[in-house]
Amino acid sequence: MPSTNRAGSLKDPEIAELFFKEDPEKLFTDLREIGHGSFGAVYFARDVRTNEVVAIKKMSYSGKQSTEKWQDIIKEVKFLQRIKHPNSIEYKGCYLREHTAWLVMEYCLGSASDLLEVHKKPLQEVEIAAITHGALQGLAYLHSHTMIHRDIKAGNILLTEPGQVKLADFGSASMASPANSFVGTPYWMAPEVILAMDEGQYDGKVDVWSLGITCIELAERKPPLFNMNAMSALYHIAQNESPTLQSNEWSDYFRNFVDSCLQKIPQDRPTSEELLKHIFVLRERPETVLIDLIQRTKDAVRELDNLQYRKMKKLLFQEAHNGPAVEAQEEEEEQDHGVGRTGTVNSVGSNQSIPSMSISASSQSSSVNSLPDVSDDKSELDMMEGDHTVMSNSSVIHLKPEEENYREEGDPRTRASDPQSPPQVSRHKSHYRNREHFATIRTASLVTRQMQEHEQDSELREQMSGYKRMRRQHQKQLMTLENKLKAEMDEHRLRLDKDLETQRNNFAAEMEKLIKKHQAAMEKEAKVMSNEEKKFQQHIQAQQKKELNSFLESQKREYKLRKEQLKEELNENQSTPKKEKQEWLSKQKENIQHFQAEEEANLLRRQRQYLELECRRFKRRMLLGRHNLEQDLVREELNKRQTQKDLEHAMLLRQHESMQELEFRHLNTIQKMRCELIRLQHQTELTNQLEYNKRRERELRRKHVMEVRQQPKSLKSKELQIKKQFQDTCKIQTRQYKALRNHLLETTPKSEHKAVLKRLKEEQTRKLAILAEQYDHSINEMLSTQALRLDEAQEAECQVLKMQLQQELELLNAYQSKIKMQAEAQHDRELRELEQRVSLRRALLEQKIEEEMLALQNERTERIRSLLERQAREIEAFDSESMRLGFSNMVLSNLSPEAFSHSYPGASGWSHNPTGGPGPHWGHPMGGPPQAWGHPMQGGPQPWGHPSGPMQGVPRGSSMGVRNSPQALRRTASGGRTEQGMSRSTSVTSQISNGSHMSYT
């Protein structure tokens, strides 16, 4: 266990700040125990620094459950530090000494339950309204700060001497709302608190229910169901209707207020703020109603304490004088009985005081006691002196000096008793007297009873504490399991999100890599096409240069041949003069040279036109090839995106199935745990009830045994009483006999005296014999009657107890059956809700997948459309430029065979497919591979004078770009292979409208 969690550890700075470092034994003196509970004791004390009266609650955190006790102390100290309200107890500090926390608070006179204990009768409605109004103001403050008291009852509603109402005992309070802990005192618990673990959370309205029960307690001296076993009361509250006021003497406003507080459904129950506007608490009432009530109570307490003092003084006096006469003692006791009955109604004790979850004195047992009625005054006085009541924490509150001054100055009796004293002197005396006087509305017998009660009834108190501890442990186990499963679910969801994110990142990286690859392919293709164009130009230029050289050589040979022919012709004609021959020969040479020059110029012009035309054709062919490559790359990219999206959707569906399986498994685990905890709880409840039944039967048997043991003494006293009556009768008869004998002796002659005496003697003997017979008969009849009465009474008590215990057991069974049914209904509801959530999530996922697929399809169509439109614009721009340069589209579309009839070293095919082979296109697939430039055409080269002959060997790829170009269709005339290929193309609009897109093959 970490040191910071160890009981009493102050290593945590936040915890250390909660406690003062001083030694409390040096700061507080004159400690007097005024209360006791399972947590420890409550003391009246005086602060030596300010001479201020305070109350100290000592709470030990050693022994069993020390860590739990320490946590309860820390929670209560934190709670007290947070609250500051006139209707809440004032916190002064907390000290630690020898594994005991000294919780110092203001001192008050007592609690509302003390009023009931002292007066032994219900409070008046106006007094209940005043107390309820003050308690409501304190509750409204707590609820506005999302805090819940969770232990509202008369014992925890305190009163100061000026008549101020204060809430106390925050050991059960919750600093968060809503909550779901099983805490409080059973008879005052709201149904949703009892069913907290089974049905969920609750809020501050549980205090409103407890306040309604407290109103009934103040009006009837005890809460509903108080004569019932505490465990049975819990079952009764959870499944039966709300209690109501029994008497008809209360006003309709009070009844409506109580009924509003005790609405079974929390949603129908008003809040504390709403109840502050109820006419019951807003009705006009005397301002001094609580002050007068407190003063009457103090007077009654003083009278009761004086009674106890006189009894003790009498006992001491008797002991000092060896005891007075019995008759005088009995007369004085009877007088004391009369005094006790005039000042108070007979108290009823309780063997059913149940401890609450609170660590305060008031919540260790209920503030009202209950025992069977006792008729004789002696038993009443014994109960008043020795029976056990519950002392609340109300006597642990300090009375402020200014409040004491106000009380003393505001008391008309104080002013009337000393009318001539100056105000300042009176105020000073009042202040000094209240500082020195131990003011309280609790009798000494109440304190003694509480201390004795804490020592007794430990078995019942421990049973309830164990039950509450079990409920807390079950709730903690369930919360631990829920947190564990929630962490597992979060971890699983995080892992799935991480897997999905990893896949998306991988897909993004792959797509980025593919795009870069495509960019590199396009750049490479551009370079290759540029090089091919240069090589193509160089090839044609080389061919043309070779042709030109051949042409020039041919001209030279022709020139020489023609020259020789001309010379021969001149030589044959000898008649022509030489000069004339020379001139004619020169002229012929010039003509030949001029003709050859013209032919050379014509050849150069045709070569230049051919070069420009072929280069333009080549560029158009390269443009179409680049378009085909772009289409292939876009198709590959879109197919890749489609594949990635399909894989992502498949993963989302798998993750949905995985989450669904985990959610159902978690729900099943929680429901199994809840069923097991309910089973253990019901088993514990049944065990506790059976133990309670055995204990009640054992107590009844013990009582009957004591009665049987006491019967001989009772019979002896009855026999002595009958014997005394017989003796008195004998004495009377003897006196009557003597009187009759004297009378007869006086009236009869002396001679008859002997006969008269004999007759009288016989008569006396006969009557005495009759008396003796009557005496024996009376004794026998008394013995038989007393034995029969005892047997009948004990048998009746046994039957009543058996019926009561059987009813409580049936009530427990009904409660447990209801809990099981509610648990099953809750499990079915949770299962249905989970199925609905899963179905909704699946539907949303499928809708998302459909939307993403539609978006991807739209993106695909848009990409294709934009690509085709851009390519069409490029073709159109190229053709427009060609027309401007004087090239016909028909001529550009029909490629010259001379472009492919001359191979050159390193020449490659013009159609490049980066994917490694001819792939499918948006149009009709081509049949056969493209033809390389280096392949010779059929029929050999044609003369340069006929450059525009038919092209038998045009590669089929050359028409591919034209076929896929919608603009080329409008520019190309019909006929020929190219026209056949282009006739199969469609426009961009028709391709998109017909759903033409890349295939996935």
UniProtKB/Swiss-Prot annotation:
What result is annotated for mutating S990A? Abolishes phosphorylation by ATM
Q: What is the effect of changing M231V?
A: In DDIB; uncertain significance
Entry comment on modification after translation: Proteolytically processed by caspase-3 (CASP3). Autophosphorylated. Phosphorylated by ATM in response to DNA damage. Phosphorylated by LRRK2.
Q: Which intervals carry biased composition (Basic and acidic residues)?
A: 375-388, 399-416, 577-587
Entry keyword set:
Apoptosis, ATP-binding, Coiled coil, Cytoplasm, Disease variant, DNA damage, DNA repair, Intellectual disability, Kinase, Nucleotide-binding, Phosphoprotein, Serine/threonine-protein kinase, Transferase
Coiled coil regions in record: 458-651, 754-877
Q: What is its EC number?
A: 2.7.11.1
Family annotation (PROSITE patterns): PROTEIN_KINASE_ATP, PROTEIN_KINASE_DOM, PROTEIN_KINASE_ST
Q: Enumerate composition-biased segments (Polar residues).
A: 975-1001
Localisation per UniProt entry:
Cytoplasm
Chain positions found as Phosphoserine: S9, S421, S445, S965
GO-annotated cellular components: cytoplasm; cytosol; extracellular exosome; microtubule cytoskeleton; nuclear body; perinuclear region of cytoplasm; plasma membrane
Give every Protein kinase domain span: 28-281
Q: Which sites are catalytic?
A: D151 (proton acceptor)
Q: How does it assemble?
A: Self-associates. Interacts with MAP2K3. Interacts with SPRED1. Interacts with TESK1; the interaction inhibits TAOK1 kinase activity. Interacts with MAP3K7.
Spell out the protein name for this chain. Serine/threonine-protein kinase TAO1
Gene designation per UniProt = TAOK1
